[in-house]
From Swiss-Prot:
Enzyme class: transferase
Chief location: cytoplasm
Catalytic residues (UniProt): D302
The protein, known as: 3-phosphoshikimate 1-carboxyvinyltransferase
Stored HAMAP family: EPSP_synth
Known function: Catalyzes the transfer of the enolpyruvyl moiety of phosphoenolpyruvate (PEP) to the 5-hydroxyl of shikimate-3-phosphate (S3P) to produce enolpyruvyl shikimate-3-phosphate and inorganic phosphate.
Species this protein is from: Helicobacter pylori (strain HPAG1)
């Protein structure tokens, strides 16, 4: 059995640790921070808002929040990070000053009205391009009043932006979503003294009576990153893999559960539970069968491109529905997946809210064809999850990806670990 500590710290927790430190009054410590481009954007923005950041060890920082958030003299650059833009919008909506949030071309084409509308319900002064649909966003911090909001979409980023505004509003605010989304924001903030009550999926958020407590967080490995290597094991005959020190929050392992339903052998062993459950995941190859994914989409939407690779190896027709949000990620991920599969000659089709893929079960004829004829270049669309998903497919087919460097957005170690997997041995350090 191959043992792997992927050393890819959780992206969601890394973002939140930095952003939440700005609502504390004393120095906070973040250990095992994800040094991916997205999370570094959040860290740089914190510095531009007045936080002092000091290296304490490898991938670890002491963050001293400012006495009051500073009005920056320049645009706050979120680069490719939707989490940075959406969560900072919630945080800054009640802070004194003028703030402009912008990003790269991809981020500035992603939907922002989904956060602008709930923030305006508080009375926030926030504007976006093209009738509030897109960034850049301009925020003039102002006093907020509590509100009730029912979100039409299940999104941890929308929920988190709302919660960060609610903590700074006058009165108790209520948030309801149509499907459970990731709950790291609630867990972390409650541990730091925020009063957030969850009753049957409805959040009631009281304003902060005092600054958040200072914290010392050590961040576990990201299950979304670990999933790529669970997928690699599932499609590689005779493979057995132990993924170590992985965050096992129930809202984050839905993709592993889907792979398990497809036939892969997957077992969780909890090693600790402090703030969040952390443990090991055992994965073993087995023949895969088709799956229909139509529920709990918010809990696995980031992993659907990777799951599409598993679907290629499954017996039967697999289906994804109710996943329209895939079209407004870093790329149109429905189009990206299906256009690449069609270029490879795979039977598949896209819908408005998903796709189907007819599994090959036996991929050897396709491999033989590409050994005789050069296969088409796989297009990443500069989307890290598309690039990494199809990079896993290179374990079985002789394919090339047009831009695997974009994996650095969330998983800087990916290329090195993939090469080690191909060799059959790991040293995750």
């Amino acid at each position: 059995m191959i043992e792997l500590d992927i050393n890819a710290s959780d992206k969601s927790l890394s973002h939140r640790a930095v952003i939440f430190s700005l609502l504390a009054q004393k120095p906070c410590f973040v250990r095992n921070f994800l040094m991916g481009e997205d999370c570094l954007s959040s860290l740089e923005i914190a510095q531009n808002l007045g936080a002092k950041v000091e290296n304490t060890a490898k991938n670890s920082f002491k963050i001293t929040p400012p006495t009051a958030i500073k009005e920056p003299s320049k645009i706050l650059n979120c680069n490719n990070s939707g989490t940075s833009m959406r969560l900072y919008s919630g945080l800054l909506s009640a802070q004194k000053g003028l703030f402009v949030l912008s990003g790269d071309n991809s981020l500035n084409a992603r939907p922002m009205k989904r956060i602008i509308e709930p923030l305006k319900a508080f009375g926030a002064r926030i504007l976006g391009r093209e009738d509030n649909h897109f960034a850049p966003l301009v925020i003039v911090g102002s006093p907020l009043k509590a509100c009730n909001y029912e979100s039409p979409i299940a999104s941890a980023q929308v929920k988190s932006a709302f919660v960060l505004s609610a903590l700074q509003a006058q009165g108790v605010s209520v948030y309801k979503e149509n499907e459970l989304s990731r709950n790291h924001t609630e867990i972390m903030l409650k541990s730091l003294g925020a009063k957030i009550h969850n009753q049957d999926g409805v959040l009631m958020i009281s304003p902060l009576e005092k600054p958040l407590e200072a914290f010392d967080f050590t961040i576990a490995n990201d299950p979304s990153s670990a999933f790529f290597f669970a997928l690699a094991c599932a499609i590689t005959p005779k493979s057995r893999l132990l993924l170590k020190n992985v965050l096992l929050n129930p809202t984050r392992i839905e993709a592993f559960e889907a792979l398990k339903k497809m036939g892969a052998s997957i077992e969780y062993v909890i090693q600790s539970k402090d703030l969040e459950m952390i443990g090991d995941i055992y994965v073993e190859h087995a023949p895969l069968k088709a799956i229909s994914i139509e529920q709990n989409i918010a809990s696995l939407i980031d992993e659907i491109p990777a799951l599409s690779i598993a679907m290629l190896f499954a017996k039967g027709k697999s289906m994804v529905k109710n996943a329209k949000d895939l079209r407004v990620k870093e790329s149109d991920r429905i189009k990206a997946v299906i256009s690449n599969f069609k270029a490879l000659g795979i039977e598949c089709e896209e819908f408005e809210d998903g796709f189907y893929i007819e599994g090959l079960e036996d991929i050897s004829p396709l491999k033989q064809r590409f050994s005789q004829k050069k296969p088409p270049l796989i297009k990443s669309f500069n989307d890290h999850r598309i690039a990494m998903s199809f990079a896993i497919l290179t374990l079985a087919l002789p394919l090339e990806i047009d831009n695997l460097e974009c994996a650095n957005i969330s998983f800087p170690q990916f290329k090195r670990l993939l090469n080690l997997f191909k060799k059959g041995s790991f040293n995750g350090n």
